[in-house]
């Protein structure tokens, strides 16, 4: 069972709306999902500012949890989307098979990069 599936079980148990196809939920649910993600991001910022690694772990896990919940609320299978994005990200290597970084250390797109095709999961 994936973490995305575990969150679905939680949502089913607690009577939360789950969409089976990609579509917007009600404004109330969309707003709730937005607020939950922002709340966890704020907790992450605070934990990082306090250099509290335990709270960083908690906030990062909660961000995943509420993001997976948002995926279910919008009917978007994040397991499938993640796999597609992972494949796209791995295409960023340079011609020599090595990563390309900018001055800040961000991985840049190599010449064989391809954009993830998420249409198949939301259309």
Task: Locate each region found by the language model.
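Flexible "arm" and connector segments at domain edges
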Residues: 1-123
